[in-house]
A protein has these predicted regions:
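Conserved pre-catalytic core of RNA-dependent polymerases
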Residues: 62, 92-302
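Catalytic palm subdomain of template-directed nucleic-acid polymerases
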Residues: 247-264, 336-359
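Basic, alpha-helical interaction scaffolds
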Residues: 398-463
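Short linear motifs embedded in intrinsically disordered, charge-biased segments
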Residues: 43-48, 471, 477-609
Length: 609
């Protein structure tokens, strides 16, 4: 009984944490971690099993990735600085840190993160912070004022993590970098000041959705849907090119990055600080309890760092300037290009000409593409096969019918068939887990598992795919009903609406409406990324004369059913249908509670009728 209560409490604690939920479930189901040590690898056609030699081989391989890629990049006809535009005349000032700021940063550190080479974990730091806060304030302020980063904060402890394929090949492992806890605190201090400055001066491209506050993969996906819908509604053909950069974070050129930082206003001591931060970095591999020798890191942004992602999006911020014709959607290194035209021959010739320009930007910035993994897709109403052949850097690209894009499987008809197949497969497996545990846990705990093992797959990207064909959505609804009947131990043929009401869970169709309502609430509160500004004007701004519905959002004219099924049309339609009490909610949480109650009430009303 005590053990059962422990698992119930743990699952409740990790309700919204998928990784830790799985850990608890594996404990409860007596599933071993099966985390075997690396016992041998292949190097120069020889099997190596000495742990010290293996650690050194791994370290040399990881440290050489950026250098090896940089050496084979052809020269560009352009200089990287030609793409940067007007220089920011303002310069950043690194204001000193203070006790309260450091205490706040430390208190928000995740206790479960592994320590770096100094073996000081976040839990220990939190325990002693009050005793060392004054020396830390002094050290960090000395770093800011001198433009120097302590050498001990520039060492990474690297753990090789197997991905897939042949376990003997070092190519099939990725490095997990663990940094000093104190370096993370210093990075956070710098991050706060840098991001505030860059936002103040509107440095970032509107088409960069990665690693930015109030920007997410969902916003990038909706921007993509918007482009496809507008093209198809105009009876044009749209080509999407899904780029695959080779080890982009590892190949960043430090001198180019520092030049761009200066261009955007990071100068003086601040620029010296970043130069110190990037230079003389070292790493070692820790394998099976043994440490390798040190290797210098001369390329890339520090993996596992807070500043790394920020520095990366600064580095590629001007990528959109490589073409004035193509549209861009960027999510860190997940970059995608789009162009539409009603004439397929003009479409192809324009894209291929513009891709030559994009190639020059990539070369000038010393990045490289994996052209075997870079694909393109044609979105069109045409039933005929279009004569479209796309060439990138003298290499013909593969035309695919579907591909993975920001966590969704996108197909060229946007039917979402492949993605829903994947969701159904994952949810079915997880329902099996809930079924195994139904006699060991009460319904309340099983509902927690539903929130961890089923709901995230239904919620993710639903604004993109959630209004697809009803036959596809019915497959998901049946799985929802099946899971609730298992949780409540109800008969297979029992009516499911009371179960949705009791659990306060929404059916898949209403889950789409719930997410769409939140998007529209944020639109009306002007908290969405800039690309959505003025997307849904009010009727009063369309008509020159007053109408009964002047304050409602204007419903766009959609020529195709495809466009009418997207958020472009359904967003304003839903918002106009909501009562004023829901729309006037003072906060997003209040709005969510009211909208959810409204949607759940429809189940009760359906029962009563």
């Amino acid at each position: 009984m005590k053990k059962k209560r422990y698992y119930v409490n743990q699952l409740a604690l990790y309700k919204h944490d998928m990784q830790n939920t799985w850990k608890v479930l594996k404990q409860a189901m007596n599933i071993s971690k099966n985390k075997s040590e690396i016992t041998e690898i292949q190097f120069n056609d020889t099997i190596v099993d000495d742990v010290g030699n293996m650690a050194n081989i791994f370290n040399k391989y990881f440290a050489s990735i950026g250098k090896n890629l940089a050496e084979v990049i052809p020269p560009s006809t352009k200089h990287f600085s030609e793409y940067l535009g007007t220089q920011n005349p303002s310069s950043i000032f690194l204001a000193p840190t203070y006790r309260e700021e450091i205490l706040d940063i430390v208190s928000n550190l995740n206790n479960k993160k592994s320590p770096g080479h100094d073996d000081i974990n976040n839990f220990i730091l939190k325990g002693v912070i009050s005793s060392i806060i004054d020396p830390l304030v002094h050290i960090f302020n000395l770093s800011l004022s001198s433009g120097q980063v302590p050498a001990g904060m520039k060492i990474a402890k690297v753990i090789p993590l197997f991905k897939n394929g042949d376990k003997l090949s070092v190519n099939n492992y990725r490095p997990i970098s663990l940094l000093s806890t104190l370096s993370k605190v210093l990075e956070k201090i710098i991050y706060i000041r840098t991001i505030k400055f860059l936002k103040l001066h509107n440095i970032f491209s509107n088409f960069q959705f990665g690693f930015r506050e109030k920007h997410s993969t969902i916003h990038a996906l909706l921007n993509f849907i918007d482009k496809v819908a507008h093209a198809i509604d105009k009876f044009s053909h749209l080509v999407g090119i899904f780029l695959d950069f080779s080890k982009a974070f590892d190949t960043i050129d430090h001198e180019i990055l520092l030049y761009k930082l200066s261009h955007y206003g990071v100068r003086g001591k601040a620029l010296e600080w970043f130069r110190s931060y990037l230079s003389n970095r070292q790493q070692y591999v820790f394998l099976n309890g043994h440490a390798s020798s040190m290797q210098d890191i001369k390329f890339g942004v520090p993996q596992g760092s807070l500043l790394g992602p920020l520095l990366f999006i600064i580095y590629i911020n001007d990528f959109c300037r490589s073409s004035d014709v193509l549209s861009f959607i960027l999510f860190a290194d997940d970059s995608n290009l789009f162009f539409s035209h009603n004439n397929p021959y003009t479409l192809v010739s324009t894209i291929n000409a513009e891709l030559d320009k994009v190639t020059q930007w990539i070369r000038a910035n010393k990045l490289s593409l994996n052209l075997q993994k870079t694909k393109y897709m044609v979105f069109s109403n045409s039933l005929n096969t279009l004569p479209i052949n796309i060439v990138f850097d003298n290499t013909p690209l593969e035309n695919v019918s579907h591909t993975k894009f920001l966590g969704l499987i996108v197909d060229n008809k946007l039917s979402w068939k492949y993605h829903i197949d994947k969701i159904c497969k994952t949810i079915s497996r997880n329902i099996g887990i809930i079924n195994k545990l139904k006699f060991h846990f009460p319904p309340s705990t099983l509902l927690t598992l539903y929130s961890s093992l089923i709901l995230p797959y239904l919620n993710y990207g639903i604004l993109a795919w959630g209004n697809t064909q009803q036959t596809s959505l019915n497959r998901l609804l049946l799985l929802q009903k099946k899971s609730l009947r298992i949780i409540y131990n109800s008969a297979i043929c029992s009516h499911a609406d009371p179960l949705f009401i009791d659990s306060k869970l929404l059916k898949i169709g209403d889950l789409y409406q719930f997410n769409l309502g939140q998007f529209m609430y944020n639109y009306n509160r002007e908290t969405l990324p800039h690309v959505f500004n003025d997307m849904f004007p009010k009727n009063q701004s369309i008509h020159s004369y007053p109408t009964r519905r002047s304050n409602e959002l204007h419903l766009p004219l959609c020529r195709t059913v495809f466009a009418q099924n997207t958020f472009i049309y359904n967003g304003p339609k839903l918002w106009n249908s909501l009562n004023d009490d829901i729309k006037a909610s003072p906060s997003l949480n209040t709005f969510k509670n009211k909208l959810k109650s409204f949607l759940l009430n429809s189940y009760s009303n359906a029962q009563n009728n």
